[in-house]
């Protein structure tokens, strides 16, 4: 029985740059801390990419997700994403497959309890949140939060006894 050649580990002489090789939609649990030191376990959706040198054919994609488990049992932060990229780089370097740059994005729904303006009823509001880290010359880090907003039409609020419609 013959073995299958590991072509991704062979040199590529065509000089084609693979600027973005990776995995998308990898779900993993995370524990996030808010500003009051409360914690919440969320489901993170990870997209992890690396850029390759022109003489490389590919990367070990399993290395891109191997490190996620390490961070599932700790409080997750932006610094953990930087640590994850460094762990991936170390593994790729050990395999002789260094990358030119990397980026990781994790998105998740974070819930906060809010009170309704008039009834004071409490309910959970989900916020779309995300962390994004790039490991390249810039070392870019970003945090994103999408806040749901609805406003009330001032005219209908003025003429209504029972509330107003949203805009």
PLM-predicted stretches and their roles:
Residues 1-167:
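N-terminal intrinsically disordered, cationic/polar leader segments
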